[in-house]
Every structure is written in C-alpha cells, then in structure tokens.
Amino acid sequence: AHRTGALLAVFTFSNHPFACFRPDKVPPALITPEQKQSLLRDLGVDVLVDVPFDMSVARIAPEAFLEQLQALGYSCLVVGNNFTYGIRGEGTVETLAASAQRLGFKLVVRELVSDGPTVISSTAIRRLIAEGDVVEAAAMLGRLYSLSGVVAHGNERGRLLGFPTANIELAESKLAIPLGGVYAVQVNVNGQRYGGMANIGNNPTFGDVAAPRLETHIFDFSGDIYDSPISIDFVARVRGEV
C-alpha cells in the first residue's frame, strides 16, 4: 500500500459475533483493544477500522456491506481464501471477485497461513493456551502471549517467604487464561523489562484463594508497584501447580 502512496487500513470487528447470538458462548479474546492498536501500528497500519458487531451488521446483505465499505475510499482489498461477509456469510470470495470487477477495485486473495499441519487461527491458539503450550501459541501469534492488569494487594505470603510477588486478579479477565501452573515469563514494568516466574491458579499450596490469580516473582526488581499496570509475557510452562 505504501509503495503506491496509499494508506494501509485494517477492518476488524471489536467484539466476537457470538456476542449477538450466543453471549454465553463468547470465546476469550487473545488481545486487548490497546494491544491490537499498538501491534497494528508497529506493523505499519495507518488506519484501524474497529467496528462493533451488532444485529444491524449481522443482517446486512453482502452488496450493502460492500457499498458501506466504499465510504472508506479503498482501491484494493486483501482477504483470506475463506473470507465471507454479509448475512449468514452469503458473500464469498467468488461473489467478492465479481463485485471487484463491477465496482472497480483490486482484489487480492491470500492462502491461509499454517504452522506445520495446523492452520493458524484464533481457535487453534486458544486451544494451545488452554493446554499451557505457550511456546507453540507464541509461534502462531508471532509474539509472546501476554496478560496485563493492575497489581493488586495480595496476602503478601510471597514476601514472607522471601520472594515478593506482583498479583493480578484474573476473575474478570476477558482474555484466554493459560492452563494453571508455573511459567517462565518476561515482565514489563514502568517501561522496563525483567525476567520472572509466574504462577496461575488458586494457590493449592495455601488452599484459601477462591478466584484465579496470576502471581509473578520479578527477578532483580524491588519497588512498590501496587496499583500500577504491568504486563506478563509467557515464555514457557515449567510445571503444573504443586
């Protein structure tokens, strides 16, 4: 796009379509809105069109959907070979190709990307994260999988044992949570990056924590970061909980 003097734009939905049809079945997200904006910006995207998926979008006819997209002034569309659009996914790559000729825009259809025998998809990545295979999930994502949050006040048991931890509550998280256990991680604190070890789970060693929690011991770090935002990048699962 930039070689031709055009802007590079990405069209995406800000929520999962199940939010309209099966709100109890909405799968966990793999990225926060802020992470999405940051990653796309780093990839050179000039414009992010992040549209809420609602019933008006779900019911729109394929041709009407393309007509609304024309307001963006695009000259070229790039889609995957399994792309569908419009009500019940009635618009396909074949109908899009016919519309491209009629409306005068260039259409580029890309093959799906695979990691070995597995097609890379959000479903496949969620499965890997749920299994604790953050190494393979990172290979599919092209980055380390990350969780972020505000450091909460815990029971300070880690401090009593000589290794204070930064605690993030996960009960309200809308992101996929890796399988419980101990992970090697990288921690981003106040613009600095540190190594660390993190535990996900209900702390069975102590047995009195009701909600899932992410507890992280940050190597070579000392400081008060209560109520501060941090992000945890998962490198590898070391073991299950004890």
What are these regions (language model features)?
Residues 14, 79-81, 234:
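A secondary-structure boundary/capping signal
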Residues 59-164, 240-241:
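Classical nucleotidyltransferase
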